[in-house]
Amino acid sequence: MTKGTGSFGKRRNKSHTLCVRCGRRSFHIQKSRCSACAYPAARKRTYNWSVKAIRRKTTGTGRMRYLRNVPRRFKTGFREGTEAKPRNKGVASSA
């Protein structure tokens, strides 16, 4: 029996599946534990020995659908449901 190239063809079962917390394919099915974020533990798994890896998955590297708009909404005090007042037509034409 060989333990090298020939044996790799036998590997057909997935040991990891998608994690519901971090979304990565790091959730170990038999252990029921995510290797990336340590789900279902309450504290998220982060180590400082891999600074570059933290930089890859930190806030701002994804879509940020909500957080992207927060600074703009903060300027107006998070007001919603109001309409802009109509501008004076005379001021716009003379300027």
From Swiss-Prot:
SUPFAM superfamilies xref list: Zn-binding ribosomal proteins
Cofactors (names): Zn(2+)
Cellular component, GO annotation: cytosolic ribosome; nucleus; ribonucleoprotein complex
Residues at which Zn(2+) binds: 19, 22, 34, 37
Zinc finger (C4-type): 19-37
Recorded GO MF terms: mRNA binding; rRNA binding; structural constituent of ribosome; zinc ion binding
Record-linked Pfam families: Ribosomal_L37e
GO process annotations (BP): translation
Cofactor binding: number and manner: Binds 1 zinc ion per subunit.
Keyword line: Metal-binding, Ribonucleoprotein, Ribosomal protein, RNA-binding, rRNA-binding, Zinc, Zinc-finger
KW RNA-binding (keyword) present: yes
PANTHER family, A to Z: 60S RIBOSOMAL PROTEIN L37, LARGE RIBOSOMAL SUBUNIT PROTEIN EL37X-RELATED
Free-text function comment from the UniProt entry: Binds to the 23S rRNA.
Family: Belongs to the eukaryotic ribosomal protein eL37 family.
Protein name: Large ribosomal subunit protein eL37y
